[in-house]
C-alpha cells in the first residue's frame, strides 16, 4: 500500500472515530434538558460524558493534525472552502467546553442555566454543521448540505439517547429510551436520503453503483441503525449502542470511500500529499503514538463503565 493511500485511510479512521465518540457527546449535550427533571437528574445525564468528552475531542485534533501534515493542500482547501461553518464548529466546541467545566463551579440557578445553554448550543452546532460540511463536500449542493446536517444531527441525538440509556438507571433511562424511539422517526428517513444519494446532487446514485463496496457500507450503516432502534425497544442497551456506533462507522466508511481519490474537486490524494520523506516520518510517529492513544481511551472507558444514579440531595 502506498503511503498516500495509507494516510488517507488513517485520516478516515480518525474522523470516523471522532464522529462515533463525539456523536454521543453531542447527543447527550442536546438531550440534557429533555431527559432531566431536576438538578440531580441533570448531573446524572451530564455525568455520563463528564470523564470522557475532552478525551474524545483528541480524535478531532489528531485527525486535523494528520491532514495538515500528510495532505496540506487538502487541509488548506477544506478550511478555506468551509471557513464559516468550521469557525462556527470551533465556537461551538469552545462554548460547550466552557459550559461543561463551568457548570460544576457555579452554585446559582442562573449560572447553571447559562452553562446548560452553552452546552446545548455548543453540542448542536458541530452535530449539524459537520454533517452539512461533508455532505456539501461530497455532493456540492445546498440541498445536500441541509440533508446531511439533519442526518448527522438526528443520528447524534439518537446515539446520545442510547448512550444515556446504557449509562443511567431509573426515570432518566426510561426517558432516554423513549427519546431514542421518537428520534428514530427522523433518523431513519434522513439516513435513507443521505446514504443513498441526494436528488439533484453532483454525485448521483449511478456513481455509487460503480463501487459496490460503497453501497455495502451505506447499507450496513442503515441496517445497523435499524438494529439499534429495535434493540433499544427491546431494552438491550449495550447492543443498541454498539449498533448505532456501527451505523456511524459505516457512514464514515462510505463518506471517505466516496471522497477517494479526490477529496476536493480537482484535487487528488496524490496531488494533495506531502513528500515521501514527510510521510515516512509521520508513519513512524503514528505507529508509536496511536497505540498509546487507543489504549488510554479504552482504559478510560473501562474505568467509567458503570451506570450512574441520580444523587439524592
Regions found by a protein language model. Name each.
Residues 1-11, 66-83, 134-145, 200-204:
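Helix-coil boundary and interhelical linker segments in multi-pass alpha-helical membrane proteins
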Residues 1-55, 61-64:
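N-terminal signal-anchor module of multipass membrane proteins
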Residues 126-139, 189-200, 250-266:
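Hydrophobic alpha-helical transmembrane segments in multi-pass integral membrane proteins
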Residues 147-151, 280-295:
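Hydrophobic alpha-helical transmembrane segments
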Residues 26-52, 68-76, 101-112, 161-179, ...:
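Juxtamembrane membrane-water interface segments of multi-pass membrane proteins
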Residues 76-89, 95-152:
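Membrane-interface helix-loop-helix junctions at boundaries between adjacent transmembrane segments
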Residues 264-282:
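Short, membrane-exposed interhelical loops at transmembrane-helix boundaries
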Residues 141-150, 171-186, 208-213:
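Membrane-water interface at loop-to-transmembrane-helix junctions
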